[in-house]
Amino acid sequence: MSKKRRNRHKKEAQEPQFDFDEAKELTVGQAIRKNEEVEAGVLPEDSILDKYVKQHRDEIEADKFATRQYKKEEFVETQSLDDLIQEMREAVEKSEASSEEVPSSEDILLPLPLDDEEQGLDPLLLDDENPTEMTEEVEEEQNLSRLDQEDSEKKSKKGFILTVLALVSVIICVSAYYVYRQVARSTKEIETSQSTTANQSDVDDFNTLYDAFYTNSNKTALKNSQFDKLSQLKTLLDKLEGSREHTLAKSKYDSLATQIKAIQDVNAQFEKPAIVDGVLDTNAKAKSDAKFTDIKTGNTELDKVLDKAISLGKSQQTSTSSSSSSQTSSSSSSQASSNTTSEPKPSSSNETRSSRSEVNMGLSSAGVAVQRSASRVAYNQSAIDDSNNSAWDFADGVLEQILATSRSRGYITGDQYILERVNIVNGNGYYNLYKPDGTYLFTLNCKTGYFVGNGAGHADDLDY
């Protein structure tokens, strides 16, 4: 047996002792573990495996020599303590090779009390800390780190789950709102469709009654007999309130009401209706207190008839006033002639010539480029040369009324105009009225007072 082995056996045979001074510098836990090592015979130079075997020798021996029962075909195999230690040592060495190094510090331990024969031995260097203790602390730290990591993972998972739940909630809310909007829109469309369908019969009734107001499909002339049914049309219009057809129906009603009012206003100035079913009655007589003003309805054909009716009424008013003046003048003349000597009576031709000579023909056309080509009535030189024809005689007040109208419309100023004969048609003499510069204004009938030009907005058709 080598000297080293003999020394080892001697050390193992020594009575274990724990120095008190050393114990003072240790904690209670460290002192307890140190005492257990001393009692187990652990030496400073022992490896971790040797320390483990010495501290758990009884358990190892008990496990090794415990009797185990097997089946008959099995047999008991005994392993020696040295082989077991060798295997455990190899396992520990592998574990130490793969694990991280654990720093340790070494302090010089005071020598334990020895027997007399061992007094000459040098002090032993003992580890200040037990490797087993350090291993346990490292494992504890690893366990704590693992717990912290698990807690962090749990918190992370919890946060992820909460985020997912929040997103799911938002998606559910958005989906619910979208479904609500779709349902609301569908409901509104259904209600609108039902409303439109329900009002279709009212629309048909309105259009039927509206068409009945006109004499033709072009809706240019109105039936006077339908005027009192305008209130019924208004009732049907009110039924369409809120529907999409109401706007169009309202515009139709407003236009119709305007036309009816215009016709009624003009007819009210005559002793009997002058416009009946869109046609002018030229035999209608204007009232003595009639007041005529230009009226526009937007219906071109109706506006023409209204203009003719207004012109007719104004000409009648002028004729009436002129006749009254003539009668007054005649009475005065008769009274004066009764007090004087009777004289030869002038010929009728001279009276006619005198009457025509009193017509104010305005300015002379000499040297002026008159727009005769724009005349609405063709020039007839033979008729113009027949100057003694009574067709050229103006009816009482006709010329004065026409000139007054022209002045009010701004066509002429004062007597600044040119008046020329044009033609005789159906016993009526037609004249052209021009501006002083020769600009054509219109052609007039000296008997009826009807006049027509080329401008828009007034009469467009000739009266023959």
UniProtKB/Swiss-Prot annotation:
It holds the Pfam family MapZ_EC1. It is a single-pass membrane protein. Belongs to the MapZ family. Residues 114-142 have a biased composition (Acidic residues). It comes from the Bacteria. Changing T67A: Partial inhibition of phosphorylation. Almost loss of phosphorylation. Residues 100-113, 315-352 have a biased composition (Low complexity). Residues 1-21, 91-150, 314-365 are annotated as: Disordered. The chain crosses the membrane at residues 159-179. Residues 180-464 are extracellular. One of its GO terms (biological process) is cell division. This is Mid-cell-anchored protein Z. Early cell division protein that marks the future cell division site and supports proper FtsZ ring positioning.
